Amino acid sequence: NQEVIDHIIKLCEQSHIQGLSILGGEPLHPRNIDAVIELCKAFNAHFNNAKSIWVWTGYLYENIVNKDIYNHVDVIVDGQYQDELHDFRLKWRGSSNQRVIDVKETLKNNEIVLYCD
């Protein structure tokens, strides 16, 4: 609801906050994705796209049902965590099957582009 969105945005107004991380519970599940998109739109509008939005999901990028999310986030970390593929050396993900996808570059190139630090 709008009250929750406003609260999240207010918390993120602090200058040391560089962006918004959305994870847990499965944010891109069909029951959740519309609310997540609404939050992302409001966040981007408020900060004029100056702060990044990252989403962690168990879905593969190609299988996300509501593709509109691609227009509102910067990075998607996709794929289910797999304990047997756990590697503590990985950045931003827990297992080697997961991808850290640069969504804006992926859309520009029409193929998966991995995020590089």
Where are these regions (language model features)?
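Auxiliary Fe-S-binding modules of radical SAM enzymes
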Residues: 10-14, 58-117
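Conserved Radical SAM active-site core
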Residues: 1-55, 59-66
